[in-house]
Design a protein with these regions (language model features):
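Extracellular adhesion/carbohydrate-binding repeat motifs centered on closely spaced tryptophans
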Residues: 1-274
Length: 274
């Protein structure tokens, strides 16, 4: 059953030295659960390699063959994720490419894995997350699209109230297998800072938009503005990818609720970019 004690010195010297206790679980034969996920009385838990039950938000790399979990906490000192920017930056740059999945085990001494839509507090602010509800990836933060919204490692990607809209870069990475075939490696979703960062992407092709005979600029979708009211105007195109490309990009516009904008309306962000 469950028991809460200070770790033995040989298991975790730092926790032993700090007199910091943690929850552990042993089965009826006295075997300690460690380095694995376990379902106990209908709820799923995860245990570090030294047996400590996990709580809170964690990135985990699971090694089933060796009963081993590599665990990162939000403030471990490397690849931190104790604020929104660090969470997304490190999820895209390190955790997702490395095969790590984000899980949430509640606060305090709860420890039960959360699934479905969940609110998680990071750096004093509440963030919307979505964790897989079933299957082999149950509890893992979703990376991809759910209900017309985009998620990275479970976190909903949305614009803040000042920006109104934000561009999300979907990056797909491929690799080559032993047979020399091109196969999917991983996919990440990255929020770009603003329209200028979007236009600066290598595969975004821009050209100045001409002024027509009426002194107006066509912004597309029957949206014309007087040239004198526009400081910058560009026609945007995208690189055409071929079968040999090992990295591809797609771009999506999302609003403050995280909904992907797929209509042809006149959408203007907080910096007056259409």
């Amino acid at each position: 059953g469950w028991f809460k004690v200070v770790s033995a010195e040989y298991l975790n010297y730092d926790k032993y030295n700090d007199d910091e206790d943690a929850w552990y679980y042993a089965d009826g034969s006295g075997n300690l659960y460690a380095g694995e996920f376990k379902t106990i009385k209908g709820k799923k838990y995860a245990f570090r390699n030294d047996g400590r039950m996990l709580t809170g938000l964690k990135f985990i790399l699971e090694d089933d063959d060796n009963d081993n979990l590599t665990v990162y906490a939000d403030d471990d000192g490397t690849y931190n994720f104790d604020n929104e920017d660090d969470f997304l930056d490190n999820a895209v740059a390190f955790y997702e490419p490395g095969g790590y999945k984000c899980y949430y085990f509640g606060g305090g001494d709860d420890g039960a894995m959360r699934t479905n839509k969940t609110t998680v507090e990071i750096d004093g602010e509440n963030h919307n997350f979505y964790f897989e509800k079933s299957g082999s990836k149950k509890g893992a933060g979703v990376t991809g699209e759910k209900d017309d919204k985009l998620y990275q490692s479970g976190m909903l990607l949305k614009a803040d109230s000042d920006d109104k809209y934000v561009v999300v870069d979907k990056t797909t990475k491929y690799t080559t297998n032993a047979a020399g075939e091109k196969v999917l490696d991983y996919v990440t979703y990255n929020k770009l800072d603003d329209a200028k960062e979007f236009m600066a992407q290598d595969d975004v092709l821009e050209s100045n938009t001409a002024v027509d005979a009426d002194g107006k600029i066509d912004l597309g979708n029957n949206n014309k503005k007087k040239a004198e009211d526009i400081s910058e105007a560009y026609t945007i195109g995208y690189k055409a990818y071929g079968s040999s490309d090992m990295t591809t990009h797609e771009y999506f516009l999302v609003n403050t609720s995280g909904k992907v904008i797929d209509n042809r309306g006149k959408n203007k962000d907080g910096s007056d970019y259409y």
